[in-house]
Amino acid sequence: SFQNGAGTQANGDLRGSVAVPPPSNVYMTANLKDLGIGSSDSTTIGLAVFSPFGTLTRWPDSSPFSTATTKAAFELIDIRPSIAFRPLPDLAIGLGADIYTFSGALGEGQVERQFRWPGGLGIPAGTGMELNGRDTAAGFNASLLYTPLRNGDGRPLVNIGLIYRSQATLHLDGQLLAGGTR
């Protein structure tokens, strides 16, 4: 609950909502030799799936900023297949893809913003409005890991890592709804 100096109060209990998908991470890796592929144990493949944001916020229609937003959702999923190779004992190289998408399997599968129309353009004030959209975009990443110093047991004491991630731009395709109508 919040009350400003003028006495306007906003209460929010998220209406029982939980961010869908919640910020979460799932990682799987496997050494190719352990999978029976090749004889070298210096190559590993991996797959990561996570939701980097998991954003869901709601405010009551009576809030002082309802003409700006009453609900915002950003249900993005990042799928990252990758491969890593260790050409030298102290150097590892990694390459991977970043696939950003909105999935209907989790939530509504779109970026969404809802608000109350302030009035004008022939739309009555207070009409529920919704902007939404979805897309899929891809990027890539490359990384290096250098271990210049190890202890007597061969465990790393110092690791130096570098990573590059390319840009991936989502060009949202969606709709504007006024009172539930396109």
Where are these regions (language model features)?
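Outer-membrane beta-barrel porins/channels
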Residues: 3-11, 21-182
